[in-house]
A protein has these predicted regions:
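Active-site diphosphate/adenylate-binding microenvironment
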Residues: 164-217
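Phosphate-binding glycine-rich loops and adjacent basic patches that engage nucleotide phosphates
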Residues: 4-11, 43-50, 98-109, 148-160, ...
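Conserved short-loop catalytic and cofactor-binding motifs
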Residues: 2-5, 32, 127, 178-182
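Cofactor-/ligand-binding subdomain signature composed of acidic, glycine-rich
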Residues: 1-25, 142-152, 157-172
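Generic structural signal for well-ordered, non-membrane alpha-helical segments
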Residues: 7-10, 14, 33, 37-44, ...
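Anionic-ligand anchoring segments at beta-strand to alpha-helix junctions in alpha/beta enzyme folds, i.e.
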Residues: 7-10, 16-87, 196-217
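Proline-rich low-complexity regions
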Residues: 1, 27, 54, 172-175, ...
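Glycine-rich, acidic loop regions that bind phosphate or pyrophosphate groups
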Residues: 57-162
Length: 217
């Protein structure tokens, strides 16, 4: 027997979600490990590039899109979560890793679109404006087809520039920590040395606690 077809999202819900995105001014996409399980990295990248929406990932979702991509802003994460007016959540649960999607981690006023293959996860820890049950690869494919002509990158340009400016303001302190010769070694210097040594497509396994936080930068 062949593989089971990937479940798609309700077309009306996809259309409703696109309407919210078209009216938003400060949207973000938050993705997680479900992107890998669904083999949806290409669809995710196509979506954020077509729409021009900034992307943030959970620790388990890192690497789906290169983190030096022009729509990824590693050090403006907290500001983006607090200032966003629309959260597009795909491939991740609203669990403790992202503060259950609630304030103060996220803006309490932000609208939310949640895509999950498990219907029980929709709105489990925070109310959502549009919930879409389906496979991440399939649903993102639906968005990519339906978004043509409906989402304009220029609408979010000011928001993207704002997040990029926050990143730029934090860069000097980050670079200073990465180049210091202090003993014991600064965690960011350690991360830089490892990064420079590894190939770009290397797989890195990071444990928890502080090294996870520094490695995120």
């Amino acid at each position: 027997a062949g593989a089971s077809p990937r479940p798609q999202g309700d077309p009306e819900s996809v259309d409703q979600a696109l309407g919210l995105l078209a009216r938003a001014e400060r949207p973000i996409v938050v993705s997680g490990s479900g992107i890998f399980w669904s083999d949806a990295a290409a669809e995710l990248q196509a979506f954020v590039e077509q729409a021009g929406i900034p992307l943030y990932t959970t620790p388990q979702g890192r690497g789906a899109i290169p983190e030096d991509h022009h729509l990824c802003f590693l050090t403006s994460r907290s500001e983006a979560f607090r200032e966003t007016d629309l959260i597009f959540l795909v491939g991740t649960r609203l669990n403790y890793i992202i503060g259950y999607g609630r304030a103060p981690r996220f803006s309490a006023e932000a609208r939310m679109i949640q895509v999950d293959i498990d219907a029980a996860e929709i709105g489990r820890t925070r109310s959502v404006d549009v919930g879409i049950v389906g496979d991440a690869k399939s649903v993102l494919g639906q968005f990519n087809k339906a978004a043509a002509g409906r989402l304009r990158q220029s609408r979010y340009a000011e928001w993207v520039n704002h997040l990029a400016e926050i990143d730029s303001q934090k860069a000097p302190a980050r670079e200073k920590a990465m180049s210091t010769d202090q003993i014991p070694i600064h965690p960011l210097r350690l991360c830089k040395e490892i990064r420079d040594f590894l190939d770009r497509d290397a797989i890195l396994v990071v444990d928890g606690q502080e090294i996870l936080n520094f490695g995120r930068v």
